Amino acid sequence: MMGGMSVVEWLLLGSTTLALLFQSFATFSVPLSNGVTLSHFNGYKFGVFGWCDTTHTHCTPLKLGYSAEDGFLFAGQDELSLPTQAKYSLSKLLVVHPLALCSMVVLWLMVVLSQCYKHSDRRLTIIILWSFLTYMETLLCFLVDVLLFVPYLDWPGWLMLVSAVLVVFSSSIACLRRRTLTSQRIEKGAKEDLELYPLYGGALGAGVVSDSESPHRPYTEGSIISVTSRASSRLLPSASELETPREELTLMDPSIKCHIERSPMS
């Protein structure tokens, strides 16, 4: 559970949480939030879903993108001008902000669920792949904000760059965690092999079990017969071993000496 998380797991969860928070600042800007803006210029405050007039506190309806005719919606207003010479059609790309936020929410949920349950290579691989998609969307958000509002880009726009860096950092942490799990699994398998070696090592050294027969694989009836026959063949002496040369045996009593001729066994 989350109470026993390691430092690496805390870093992964913390980086994704901060990235989600920073993206929320930029997405929920004016007119959703009057105090948070992507840019302010010439009496206007710009956000993802519209803009507001700071003088008369008027805001456009919620929509994606800006239009030059928006300034004439209120009496006494001039034509709306963007901080840069970018075309108004480029402001339609602000749609990547809510898309990136949704991807970030999904990434954050996957990280939280991975902390609550046992880690697996599959879950971490999905997190790594999804974080790459989230990073591309977050970086695109920052580029759109730069093209539209630089040099009047406010701090929520710059937080998108920080969020992109945090997504890369969290992806690196997930890669490190996945590599650690793989190494632990390999070490565990090697340890189990060492523990099983006293059980099967003697049989392998005596030639009872061939190299092709893994000790982890259960024996079939045919393999048992094969192993038994090979074991019996090694236990029975060969014909050459049965042949014993003639030996001269000397009795313990030095006064009696006899030569006993031992004939070879047939």
From Swiss-Prot:
Protein topology in the membrane: Multi-pass membrane protein
Any GO CC annotation of this UniProt entry: plasma membrane
Parts of the chain on the Extracellular side: 23-92, 145-148
Domain of life: Eukaryota
Record's signal peptide: none
Cytoplasmic face residues: 1, 114-123, 170-266
PANTHER family for this protein: PROTEIN DCV1-RELATED
Role this protein plays: Required for the proteolytic cleavage of the transcription factor RIM101 in response to alkaline ambient pH.
Protein's name according to its UniProt entry: pH-response regulator protein palI/RIM9
Lineage: Eukaryota, Fungi, Dikarya, Ascomycota, Saccharomycotina
